[in-house]
Every structure is written in structure tokens, then in C-alpha cells.
Amino acid sequence: MSKSLKKLVEESREKNQPEVDMSDRGISNMLDINGLFTLSHITQLVLSHNKLTTVPPNIAELKNLEVLNFFNNQIEELPTQISSLQKLKHLNLGMNRLNTLPRGFGSLPALEVLDLTYNNLNENSLPGNFFYLTTLRALYLSDNDFEILPPDIGKLTKLQILSLRDNDLISLPKEIGELTQLKELHIQGNRLTVLPPELGNLDLTGQKQIFKAENNPWVTPIADQFQLGVSHVFEYIRSETYKYLYGRHMQANPEPPKKNNDKSKKISRKPLAAKNK
């Protein structure tokens, strides 16, 4: 039989245990867990696979947290106090219902991994200081509603992994070419037709690099290069011919491809009542 939540809290306090795992316990409110916010010593808190809809401001009491995992809940909003977690390195908010991030979210000074996969976020959801998260090494934004990736992405120069799969992206900013430490770029399942020539600044064709771009309505010359392989795509977008064609394409300001309607089937779109039946 699994230990009660009360017992987990008591044990963590008595034995000074740094990690608390409360995953898959049917928890709908963190304030119901007696004593949780007195565990200021803990460095890791796992609350994945629960039924949380909000995170209380008290989260700031857990000031030594380095890992915070809320994967697969029903969280619709976060408190501004979350950004006071000065030691937080790894924050997993994947599979929730977020459509906005709180003001000041970008002032997490130690954050290295941020997972926002499978929410309802878009370019207007990000607070002004989001791209101050310059310590980020991995940013997961897949399965959201981004049509545009803000040019400030270029400020996240330590990024090694950027996942943008299954959004509604119609273009990538030239600033993506400033992410010279990038080892993985996932842009499959969007509405992209062209790539900025600046992407050619990156080395994503080696054996240890990953570049995934299928299921996009590429213009014919790029689609042809993909048939030959990723290294051919990068060679092509670095060419003067492509730079000229890209310039003309952008000037013509073509109508973006239509949205894919499959996205409305996302679980995070459904009303809560329907999901819990």
C-alpha cells in the first residue's frame, strides 16, 4: 500500500529527504497537503499525473527547489510567485491547460530545462521578460498554438534543444541563426514553407545533431532538397541562389497555408467536465 501524503511530508521533514514524489495521487489542491509548504529544505517535488488546476502562491516557500514537475495536470494558471524560485533548474509543465504565463516569469535565474509541451500557449502568452531566461539549455514548446516564434529567441544563446513540433508556425525568425549551441531542432508538423537563410549558420547535420522538419508544406525547391537529405537542405539554404529566392518570397508576402483543424481535438481544448467523465 502506498504511503499517505501526510506520511510522505513527515518522513521528508524528519529524515531531511530532499526529494518528494507525490505523482498519481488524485491531488486536486496543493493546499490540501498538510505541511507541504513547510518543507523548505526540499530540492525536488514531483506532482505529475494529478488533478491540479492551479498552483498556490505558497510555492515560493519551497525556496530550495531545483526540480519541479507538474506534468499531466489541468493547471490553467501559475502564480507570479513561481519566479521567486531562485534555484529552480528544471520545470516541467507539460500536458496542462496554460494559455498564459505569469508576469515576471523570465526572472528564474537558474532555469535550464523548461517543458511547456501540450498546452494552449501562443506568442501572445509569453510575458515581456520571457527571453531573459538566458540560462535555458532546453525549451520544449511542442503541441501549442504558436504562429510566430518571437525574434527574441535569439537571446537564448545557451539553447541546445528547441522543440516546436506541432504548432501553427508560418515562419521562423532569422534570429534562430544566433543559437549556435543548438544540437536539436524539432519543427515538424507546422505551416512552414521556407527556412531563413540564417538557419544555415547552425550545424545540425552531424551524427550527434537532430533536425526534424517533416509534415510542413515546403516550397518545391526545399522539398526537393529534403528528398536528398538534411545536409542538402543546409547546403541549399546557405547558397546565394536561395538567399535571393528567399528575399523575393518574403517581399511577395504570400498567404500562409491554412491551419490544420486536427488540433481542435487536443485534450487541453476540451472542457474539464467532459474530460473527467
UniProtKB/Swiss-Prot annotation:
What the entry lists under SUPFAM superfamilies is as follows: L domain-like (SSF52058)
Keywords attached to this Swiss-Prot or TrEMBL record, sorted alphabetically, are: Acetylation, Leucine-rich repeat, Repeat
Q: Where are the annotated LRR repeats, by residue? A: 41-63, 64-85, 87-109, 110-133, 135-156, 158-179, 181-202
- One Pfam annotation reads LRR_1
Provide the positions where the record notes the PTM N-acetylserine.
2
Q: Mind telling me which InterPro entries this protein's record contains? A: Leu-rich_rpt, Leu-rich_rpt_4, Leu-rich_rpt_typical-subtyp, LRR_dom_sf, LRR_domain-containing, LRR_R13L4/SHOC2-like
Query: Where are the residues of the annotated region Disordered?
Result: 1-23, 250-277
Bias kind Basic and acidic residues: ranges: 7-23, 256-265
Instruction: Name the SMART domains for this protein.
Output: LRR_BAC, LRR_TYP
Q: Name one GO cellular component term.
A: PML body
- What is the annotated role of this protein in its UniProt record? Potentially plays a role in the Ras signal transduction pathway. Capable of suppressing v-Ras transformation in vitro.
Q: What is this protein called?
A: Ras suppressor protein 1
